[in-house]
UniProtKB/Swiss-Prot annotation:
Swiss-Prot/TrEMBL keywords: Cytoplasm, Glycosyltransferase, Purine salvage, Transferase
Name of the gene encoding the protein in the UniProt record: apt
Family (UniProt): Belongs to the purine/pyrimidine phosphoribosyltransferase family.
Keyword Magnesium: no
GO molecular function annotations of the record: adenine binding; adenine phosphoribosyltransferase activity; AMP binding
Involved pathway(s): Purine metabolism; AMP biosynthesis via salvage pathway; AMP from adenine: step 1/1
Full protein name: Adenine phosphoribosyltransferase
GO cellular component, one term: cytoplasm
Lineage of the organism: Bacteria, Bacillati, Actinomycetota, Actinomycetes, Propionibacteriales
Pfam families on file: Pribosyltran
Subunit: Homodimer.
Subcellular location: Cytoplasm
HAMAP family (UniProt xref): Aden_phosphoribosyltr (MF_00004)
GO BP annotations listed: adenine salvage; AMP salvage; purine ribonucleoside salvage
Major place of residence: cytoplasm
Length: 185
């Protein structure tokens, strides 16, 4: 069986829909806008299939129990990946956004600190999860999410990212966790 992955048919066309927006949100920044990709059904389907691939074995069966998406664009991509895999979706939110008891992990930002949270009952001990997000930059959010999953007694099977900023050290922050990126810029 051929599984969709980073070389899946239609994926290169889908990734070509990502628009460059110069000087946004500030001068000197080249923003990568994924909204044109999201607006095209076939493109979104190709990206979801490729992001789901690390959550499957060679027969196509899911090898994860949950998909976690990091706030906020990880929600947009993670929920359909969970549907494609036939597993549940768990949102990882910024501090104070979840209404029930949570686990929390704080991590350093360039100028300060941020905290991520997940509901305490969102993962079971022993669950294997696939982390999904739109961008891997410094790796702080992904690393904090890995730590949060481990705090729940679960493990991260793999990380699936739409775009990796290759000029930043995000990959190194993941340690030995397998990483799939669909586009490196």
């Amino acid at each position: 069986m051929t599984l969709p992955g980073p070389e899946a048919p239609g994926l290169s066309e889908a990734l070509a829909l990502i628009a460059d927006v110069p000087d946004f949100p500030q001068p000197g920044i080249l923003f990568k806008d994924i909204t044109p990709l999201l607006a095209e059904h076939a493109a979104l389907e190709a990206v979801v299939a490729a992001l789901a691939a690390p959550g499957r074995d060679q027969t196509g069966a899911p090898v994860v129990d949950k998909v976690l998406g990091m706030e906020s664009r990880g929600f947009i991509l993670g929920a359909p990946v969970a549907l494609a895999l036939g597993v549940g979706f768990v949102p990882v939110r910024k501090a104070g956004k979840l209404p029930r008891a949570t686990y929390a992990v704080s991590y350093a930002l360039e100028y300060g600190e941020a905290t991520l949270e997940v509901h305490q009952d969102a993962l079971e001990p022993g669950d294997r999860v696939l982390l999904v997000d739109d961008v891997l930059a410094t790796g702080g959010t992904a690393r904090a999410t890995i730590d949060l999953v481990e705090k729940c007694g679960a493990s991260v099977h793999a990380v699936a990212i739409l775009m990796e900023l290759g000029f930043l050290p995000g990959r190194e922050a993941l340690g030995t966790v397998p990483l799939t990126t669909l586009l490196t810029v």
